[in-house]
Amino acid sequence: MASASQFLLEDQTDEDFFDKLVDDAYSPTEAQASSSVTELKFDDESDSDDIRAFSNLSIGKDPLGGGDGTLNEAILGNDVANEGASGSVGEDEPSSIAPEAVQFPHSDARELRDDEMRSEVADMPLSETAKECTIVNEPGIPGVKELDWGSFDADLSVNDGRGFGSYSDFFTELDATAGNLQGKADVAVATGGNLVANDTNNTSVGFEQHQGQLHHDSASGQYVDNSQSWENLYPGWKYDASTGQWFQVDGHDASMNSQESYENSTSNWENVAANNSDVAYQRQSTASAVAGTVENVSTWNQVSQVSNGYPEHMVFDSQYPGWYYDTIAQEWRSLDSYNQAFQTTGQANDQQVQNGNSFTAVDHSRESNVHDVYDKNQILRTQKFDIQSQHGSWDQSYYDKNQQATNMWQPENAGAAEAAVTPASLSNSGGNQQVNNLYSTGPVAEQFKPYESGVQSFIPQHMNVANVTQNGPMSFSNGFYSRQESVDDAPQSFQSSQLFSPSAGRSSDGRPPHALVNFGFGGKLILMKDDSGSLQNSSFGSQKGTGGSSISVLNLAEVISGSASYSSLGENSLSYFSCLDQQSLPGPLVGGNVGSKDLHKWLDERILNCESSYMDFSRGKLLKMLLSLLRISCQYYGKLRSPFGSDALQKETDSAEAAVAKLFAIAKEDGVQNGYAPISQCLQHLPPESQMQVTASEVQNLLASGRKMEALQCAQEGHLWGPALVIAAQLGQQFYVDTVKQMALRQLVPGSPLRTLCLLVAGQPAEVFSTGSTSDISFPGSVNLPPQQPQFGCSSMLDSWEENLGIITANRTTDDELVITHLGDCMWKERGEIIAAHICYLIADKNFDTYSDTARLCLVGADHWKYPRTYASPEAIQRTELYEYSKTLGNSQYTLLTFQPYKVMYAHMLAEVGKLSTAQKYCQAVLKCLKTGRSPEVEMWKQFVSSLEERIRIHQQGGYTANLHPEKLVGVLLNFFGSKTHRPVGGMPPPAPHSTKGNLQGNEYQHQQQEATKLAYSQSVNTMSSLMPPASVEPTHESGGSGRRMAVHTRSVSEPDFGRTPIQEMADSSKEKAVDGVTKLKSSGSVAGSRFSRFGFGIFKDTVGRVLARSSKEAKLGAENQFYYDDKLKRWVERGVEPPAEEAALPPPPTIGAFQNNSLGYENKSDMIPSNGNWSSGGPTPSENSSGIPPISHGSNQFSARGRTGVRARYVDTYNPPGRGNSHTMIPSPSVQTAKPPIPAKAKFFVPAAPASFSNDQAMEPAAAETRQEEISADEVVASSGAPPPMMMQRYPSMDNIQRNGLGISVNGDNHQPPTSRRTASWSGNFNTSFTPPTSPSTFKPVLLNSSSSSLGEELQEVEL
């Protein structure tokens, strides 16, 4: 910034110089005579006042129109001068325009006394060759006449090789950076009120650096170096250098002011000026005129950033004034329709600085006039738009595109009493506004076009104006390079013009239009924007979109990968999209086919990523430790610790504990090397050697005398812990544990790993986290460590948690999981280290829980307490899946059920980024894991997974539910053919009937099955052997090409078979009986032909139906039902088929009396009657058992009459468990079988097989006989009696309390029940009726069953009848 002394040297002129210069009365001799006068003389001001006085000068006409060309300085009133060294005073109330002058809102002037200010300036030395200069004010003749301008370049040696300088030097030396100045020969200073003057020493920030313009509203001229530049300032006029005269160009209208060219005097202007723009003027007329007003012509200082004010799609051409080409609409349009948007009057707004500690910079645009020699009352003035800009500091760099303002020129009638638009009424629109110098073109005939608002537009032809285009930040301090303006460093009230409607193009709530963005399924990003230009021109509100809207469907992964934040360092590299896209696991681990090599590669990459420089050291160290722990778990099949009590030697060589301990040791070494972990001390007190010698001698003497207790106590007090542990081990386990505890508490530092291990060995886990010490003994001359700082809680334990966890893991003790778990809780709650806490939980093998306030583990490394909504991140899900996979390596049946919902979430995340195939694999893996679950939440999870899988499948098929892809269609047809060929070919052949030699019951049972095949619509009873599948499940087959094996359940006996009609198949075929009685079908050609013809037609029909599906939307109700229920027959009957003839009813079974057999010796029935003559048993009588139906063997019942041979011998007979009878205690049945009447071959009633003898039974059932145990032999009570042996009741597991009917003796020794009451078992408690002939005297052995307390819980309830 130029100093005051520089201004004093440059301003060494006086009033006489200008008077003589204007009156053409100046001569070189006078200039030389006055060259010695160098002082500035003012009436009452200081040396700096001449600067302000000179800055208020302007070139203008004679106020009175006399044309004498005198210098007149207008009266200034209520001016406020700011002489501060750093700052400018804000303008509170901008003054209005005086009737006789034009206001300079920010002129730098001081308050002047009286109504006139005179300046006495010393004469400057001029060359003697200077000619006279006169002012000519005649119409058609230039107002300035130059006789000889060469004198300004004379005397180069006097002015540092530049002479006095040219006319441009006269102003540029005032300010080395001033440029783009225009001026006239006449000077007039405007009058104004409440003017704010800034000290010129402090009004420009970064003045020297930016080639900017000095902040003076001063009269100045343009920096020109030749006559061509002067001719550009006066369009229509030409300067003749030889004669020094100005001549008007023929055919040119001076009032048009067309083709103005603006040049910049700064050295950098040529480097930044690029484009062309058009200037638009608006003329505003006033209501009245006041006589005697002075026409004031000010200068317009060009702003360096000159954007044309129009959108980029508007292209102008000088050949077509008044028109512009719209590149979007591809057509020419009139500029008048576009200019109507600028009719709105700005509103005054006081912009408030909203950001604290911010500076407000105001750029003052210059007033500029276009002089019309015919209309002396016309003044062209720019509306003033002060742009506020907020900065954080003076050293910030700015993008010039964010510093924007708008200038609009308005020609104004000088005779106006009051202006319609004044600078005081113009408002400033804050924010990032574009610097627009609004230019327009138009024909001369439309010079004054009235508008409804009373604003007339003065439209010149197209002009060439340099436009600054700057892309990138410019490093400078709060000097706006783009505008080359000065900056005031204090907030002010500033005015501007809002050239657009604030509500134009906005919604009802005032929001501007914007593009619409939405996310689509499958990683799609849908973008909808308006291409009609409404977004670009929304601030003007005058253009209507003609280009329409466009919808773009983008891949989300490509958009994210192309962004700058995706590849940047920091947390973004581990962000959501990065983890799913580039760092995702290689497919589902559980239920997938991932290779171990790929998995270890992924782990190595993640661990290496934790060591990057951008990640925080503490977090990176913990995350690396967690991933390394998971890798160890995969290497040792899900085990991080060996079971307690395993081989200690194996633990040291190759075990999970050794790997985990090594991991913590490496982490500790890294921390010590990096200075993060100090070396810890373990011992509290070190007794001196002399004291240790005394203690050892005393302990030795006590042991020699046999006083072990006193020796142990002496060793503990003297801290001689070695001998103390040996003595305590001899005294017992309790003494040993107590000694270890005393040593840990009294000598080891709290929180040290050695103390932790000693306390765990002593069985004192509660003392691990204590910080107190019981050592209060001080030894004379002992070496004590520095006192420990008082610590709260278990902070000392947490400081070295890695070492403590490592020593606990490597040295397994009882219940150390509780200590590890508590350590993790403390790390989470007190330190907030979630990763460290989860490391402890994984080593302690804690279970994963569902989300709750008390759950410890939901996802590995995720804090569900602190971040309940976002803890389910992709990284945490990947780590948890890795842990689940390590567990399944050791146990293939392991399922982490609570983790399956997070897998579904991960599948959704993968689908969002476009990885649909991987997401579908996860859905299939989750469904596979949920097969075994039966809880309600599992069923809900299955529905979610199925819906997601279906949505992915439909999306992959292009939105169609049926996949008609040629490759997949072939597979569907092949599966379909395979399912159709299953019916004619048939499944598993029916098994041959199983029979047992010598077992009449089995033959009769098979005979009943064979006869049942004659019944219509019935299904034969299962006759397959145990090698065949169960009867309720038919052979499985592939169904419908779905790849799933489905078991088709058979129907019950009463359910009709709608798929097959055995009556129709048997009607046309001949039947024959086999030798064994099994019905066989004759294979005839007609049957086979019809069968295969139906098969071929069915294939053709179904194939055509699947491939050529009907496009109609009619419901397919299927064929009419051919079956109906016949109320008379009480069964289902097929239409058109004769019902089978009614079969004859079965004859009644033979009566019991017809098969009485007295061969068993039951004649003496009185011997069996007890003394009371009452049988309270509900079982059959001996007479009933002597019927023709043979009694069932005592070793089996009627439900297991068939022999247990072959495979059946390996299975448990639930109806006849072993141990119910014993050959030694039970009386065998007679060897001779009882006779029975012959049974017809085709008898249709069930006849049980004859019971096998005991010997045969024992031979047929060797396995069962060997497993029978004697249960009641030890409890028998032998009683001498002449009566025959009583009826034996077979014992069942729950019949200990049954009354011994017939004996009169209860189990507990009480008397029997009265005859009116009886007891029956709630289970199948039948009585054995096997007796032997009376070969001995009347004696009987009453058997008392032992009632053990162990069977009380298994006893069945007895029913009182």
Swiss-Prot record:
For bias type Polar residues, the affected ranges are 996-1013, 1169-1200, 1222-1234, 1308-1325
The cross-references to Pfam families, in alphabetical order and at most eight, read: Sec16, TPR_Sec16
Report the protein name in the record: Protein transport protein SEC16B homolog
GO CC: one term? Answer: Golgi apparatus
Tell me what gene encodes this.
SEC16B
Q: Where in the cell is it found?
A: Golgi apparatus; Endoplasmic reticulum
Name one process (GO BP) from the record.
Answer: intracellular transport
Source domain of life is: Eukaryota
Q: Where is this region: Disordered?
A: 82-109, 487-513, 984-1013, 1025-1062, 1163-1204, 1216-1235, 1306-1361
Role played: Required for protein transport from the endoplasmic reticulum to the Golgi apparatus.
Note whether Endoplasmic reticulum occurs among the keywords: yes
For the modification Phosphoserine, which residues carry it? S46
Family from the record: Belongs to the SEC16 family.
The keyword Phosphoprotein belongs to this UniProt entry's keyword annotation: yes
Low complexity: compositionally biased ranges: 491-503, 1326-1354
Q: What is its main location?
A: Golgi
Could you say what a knockout of this gene produces? Answer: No visible phenotype under normal growth conditions.
Could you tell me the keywords of this UniProt record?
Endoplasmic reticulum, ER-Golgi transport, Golgi apparatus, Phosphoprotein, Protein transport, Transport
